[in-house]
Amino acid sequence: MFVKSETLELKEEEDVLVLLGSASPALAALTPLSSSADEEEEEEPGASGGARRQRGAEAGQGARGGVAAGAEGCRPARLLGLVHDCKRRPSRARAVSRGAKTAETVQRIKKTRRLKANNRERNRMHNLNAALDALREVLPTFPEDAKLTKIETLRFAHNYIWALTETLRLADHCGGGGGGLPGALFSEAVLLSPGGASAALSSSGDSPSPASTWSCTNSPAPSSSVSSNSTSPYSCTLSPASPAGSDMDYWQPPPPDKHRYAPHLPIARDCI
């Protein structure tokens, strides 16, 4: 009976160890130990119970140590996996946040550039309008409160500058006998201005000549454009017309062999 009770106790301990270390690699080592213990008990039925208990305790301690070692071996692997997952998650979050920040930065840069371009265009238009207003102030318009568009202002300024240039050139050419030239050229510049042609035509029935002509004579007879109190034996008459009849001829630059600020015009000279 004594031998049978010890055998039962050993079997129960082995069953407990098997249940505890079923997932550990030390199970394979424990199973041969238990089988060898059974064989030894069968071979030596007369062995003392203290030795058998000692062997059973040693086997149980070894099994427990193997289970603990297996659990400790699994824990670092699990911890490493968790750490790896934790490292992956922040990297993905950082990538998403970086992409969002990049998109926001691009949108902010585009908006800033658009605002700067709008400000530059607004300033350019303000400067252009201010320059045209200053040009309208020095141009003689009839009536004085006439509103000129941008293209009309530029065309009238071109005609007015041309008339002043012709006045200076003919005054130098004719000497002191060209008293009536500035008035004639000024009246012609008025005819070239928008709204001035109708006013001038309503006051006088004469229309501007199609081409610019002038003549120098030694007769004291005054012409239509020379003042009646002129005492010079020479008289110069000028009836300038528009610098050109069409827009293409109007805006053509002067040839390089002529004066740089006087446009080239066909001039017919009749000297008697």
UniProtKB/Swiss-Prot annotation:
Give all residue intervals belonging to the bHLH domain.
112-164
Q: What is a single molecular function from GO for this protein?
A: E-box binding
- TM spans (from-to): none
Family annotation (Gene3D superfamilies): Helix-loop-helix DNA-binding domain
Question: Does the entry feature the keyword Transcription, yes or no?
Answer: yes
Q: Which UniProt keywords apply?
A: Activator, Developmental protein, Differentiation, DNA-binding, Neurogenesis, Nucleus, Transcription, Transcription regulation
Cite the SUPFAM superfamilies for this sequence: HLH, helix-loop-helix DNA-binding domain
Quaternary structure per UniProt? Answer: Efficient DNA binding requires dimerization with another bHLH protein.
Which protein is depicted?
Neurogenin-2
Report the source organism: Homo sapiens (Human)
